[in-house]
From Swiss-Prot:
Name of the protein: Histidine biosynthesis bifunctional protein HisIE
Record-annotated membrane-spanning stretches: none
Listed GO MF terms: ATP binding; phosphoribosyl-AMP cyclohydrolase activity; phosphoribosyl-ATP diphosphatase activity
SUPFAM superfamilies membership: all-alpha NTP pyrophosphatases, HisI-like
Pfam families documented for this protein: PRA-CH, PRA-PH
GO biological process: L-histidine biosynthetic process
Amino acid sequence: MNVDDLTFDDKGLIPAVVQDAQSKEVVTVAYMNRESFEKTVETGETWFYSRSRQELWHKGATSGHTQKVVDIRYDCDGDALVVLVELKGPACHTGKYSCFFESVFGKKIYGASDRFGIIATLEALIAEREAEMPEGAYTTYLFEKGVDKILKKVGEEATEVVIAAKNRDAEELKWEVADLLYHLLVLLREQKLPVDEVLAVLEERHRPKEE
C-alpha cells in the first residue's frame, strides 16, 4: 500500500491502535501523521504524533521500551490503523503492560479477551509479567533465569503429569496438567510464539478434508 491510500483527518492525523502481536491485546491508542507513519514503516519501530506537544515522538526513545513493528493494518475506509508490535517493555508510561488497566465496572483487568477463557487470561498475565517484571513474582523469576530454566520446569512438570497418570491419581493429574500448561505458556511467550498459532495448527489438523 501507499501512504496516499490512507485518509487523515482535517488535522492531518490518523488513529493507531497498538496491539501486542503475541497476546493480541490492545496496549495503547495513539495518533500518527504522515511523517510519523512513514518513519514507523522506515525504521520498523513505532513513531507517533503528540497532539499536546505538537511534535513527533519515538516510542521508547527515553525509556527504552520500544515497539518493534510486526505488521500495520488499515480498515476498509483507510482512516484507522492497527499496529501489531513486539513489546520491549511496558506500553504505558505508568509502567503498566497496557494503558487499558482500568475498568468502568471495577473489574480486575489482566487484559484478557474472551477468545478461550482462562488460557487467554494466563497468556495476557504472563505478557504483563514479562513487560513489568514485578519483584518477587514467580513468572518474573522464570524470565530472569531464561529459557534453560523454563525448559527445565516444562520437563519436570511433564514428568509429574506422567507419574500422576501412571498412578491413576485424577486429583493429582489435574493439578500437574495445570502446572504444565502454565509453564508451556511461559515458554511460548519467551519464544515469541502466540498461542493463536498453536491453536491454528490444531484447527488445521482437525479441519474436514474436502472430497
